């Protein structure tokens, strides 16, 4: 039974992330009403992470794609920094 449940959750993780967004929103409202500001911020962060996870799932972006994009950005930034003049940024006195 646990294997079946795990399989459904892994195959339908977009649904799981949507439920997590709903729970984070509900918790955020309850924590703010109860003056638990720290827990409200944590639940807001959970909601943002769940929303990003949901959007990545809908767009078909995997963690391997994120890694490839990050390495591309890193190589471009290193190349740009190697081509900047040594006196840049200039200090105006």
Curated annotation (Swiss-Prot):
Pfam family, one: YjcB
Superkingdom, natural source: Bacteria
UniProt xrefs under InterPro entries: UCP030798
Protein name: Uncharacterized protein YjcB
Source organism per UniProt: Escherichia coli (strain K12)
Gene: yjcB
């Amino acid at each position: 039974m646990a294997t079946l449940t795990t399989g459904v959750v892994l195959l339908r993780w977009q649904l799981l992330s949507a439920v997590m967004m709903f729970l984070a929103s509900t918790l955020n409202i309850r924590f703010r009403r109860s003056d638990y500001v720290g827990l409200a911020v944590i639940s807001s962060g959970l909601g943002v992470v769940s929303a990003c996870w949901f959007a990545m799932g809908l767009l078909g972006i995997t963690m391997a794609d994120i890694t490839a994009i990050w390495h591309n950005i890193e190589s471009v930034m290193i190349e740009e920094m190697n081509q900047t003049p040594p006196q840049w940024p200039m200090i105006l006195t």
